[in-house]
Amino acid sequence: MKIQLNNIQVRANHGCWREEEVIGGDYRVDVWLEGNFEVSAESDDLEKTIDYVAVKELVYAEMNVRAKLIETVLVRMHSAMKVRFPNAHSVGIRLTKINAPMGHQVESVSVEMEG
């Protein structure tokens, strides 16, 4: 079974440019966790599944730690998810930087990791 949180919207100060550090930018995070959640489905017990609120809070906490590269944020967030949710067999994250300052109009830039 896969649990997904889609389009978590975050404002953060990642990037190589001084303006990004000061002004910040908009980000979108998608997280999916795979595991055997049938027991929680049968028991209707939150303690036996992934708490969606805890996932969202972990995303916000990791996005709040500044980095120059979104790749750095992604790897750090992925590691934290694996530690926090050991009952997930696999964790996937897509981190999207909206309107990255690239000199040309690009809607977004994304990095993704799963495992």
Locate predicted features.
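N-terminal, polar/charged subdomain of small-to-medium soluble alpha/beta proteins
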Residues: M1-G115
